[in-house]
Regions:
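Flavin-dependent oxidoreductase catalytic core characteristic
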Residues: 1-300
Length: 300
């Protein structure tokens, strides 16, 4: 049954496993939503061509794809940490403690956006029950409520940081992955992530000086930022592995676009992606090999 004086802590370990399962479910829902959007956009013609040829729709699909690939990387890597901890790795317990609420907080909430965009892209057909989109939206909303609504889970991320210092092993893992990204064309993007890690660390260190109400307001932005740092490090590292094995720059490009979308400072009125970025969408979707020239330096 466990220790009498550690009931809540033991219960939270069970909840954390359930949260990982919930995040993985949401990642699968997002992938289905992306597939539905691609099938529709390729098959539906408008303005003398397929919908997927239109820049705004391509931008929506690309953003959905980034969300899907990042979520898959996060849940699978978190599951690997759980396996190590479950086989006796004490050092991974602290890491798993913060990974699960981070993943649950962002992925299940983001699934609401991705499924809604997929429904919107299909138009009126997406709203009616003859198509899968309406069910995907409902299921996405349910997932963000299970095992704690988003604000509650964000506060749990903050507790894991303040009470257990779980952000330190997380930052160490992120930094270790980024050190293994040796492709020169990816270095500017790696540097952007490392800069974001340091600014996030300073922000967290400043919580001790805040009143409780002010500190709690920091919980959700911090949880979101930690997710983006984790996801970016995973995508870039996976991209390095893919490049080393088959000289394919696809995943490095996806990682760079993720950093560009979520971590690089930009004018909020500017588009998230350039026409050049969108030009690679078909190759990314098809998992065709991308050349090194796909990677470019971040905008100043």
């Amino acid at each position: 049954m466990g220790q009498v004086d550690a009931g809540f802590k033991q219960m939270m370990e069970m909840v954390n496993l359930s949260r990982l399962s919930n995040a993985m479910r949401a990642a699968g829902i997002m992938r289905r939503a992306l597939l539905e959007s691609l099938v529709h956009a390729r098959g539906r013609a408008a303005f003398s061509g397929p919908l997927l040829a239109l820049p705004l729709l391509r931008a929506n699909v690309l953003e959905m794809l980034l969300d899907v690939e990042a979520a898959a990387s996060v849940v699978f890597s978190s599951a690997a940490v759980f396996d190590r901890w479950n086989h006796g790795s004490a050092e991974d317990r602290q890491l798993f403690r913060i990974l699960t609420p981070i993943a649950k907080c962002w992925i299940t909430a983001r699934a609401r956006t991705v499924t809604s965009e997929a429904m919107n892209g299909r138009g009126g057909n997406g709203y009616i029950e003859e198509w899968v989109n309406a069910r995907l939206v409902r299921d996405a909303y349910l997932g963000s409520i299970w095992e704690g609504a988003t604000p509650i889970v964000a506060l749990d991320v903050q507790r894991a940081i303040v009470r257990e210092g779980c952000h330190e092993p997380l930052f160490a893992v992120i930094g270790g992955r980024l050190q293994r990204v040796t492709e020169p064309a990816a270095k500017p993007w790696v540097d952007l992530v490392l800069q974001s890690v340091e600014s996030t660390r300073r922000r967290i260190d400043g919580w001790a000086l805040l009143a409780r109400e002010e500190a709690e307001l920091e919980a959700k932005p911090a949880a979101d930022q930690l997710y983006h740092l984790l996801a970016a490090s995973l995508l870039l590292h996976e991209g390095q592995v893919l490049r080393d094995r088959v000289q394919d720059f696809r995943k490095l490009f996806v990682g760079a676009l993720y950093v560009q979308r979520w971590l690089q400072p930009r004018d909020s009125s500017a588009p998230a992606f350039s026409a050049r970025d969108l030009g690679w969408l078909d190759a990314i979707v098809a998992w065709s090999g991308l050349p090194a020239s796909a990677l470019r330096r971040p905008h100043a």
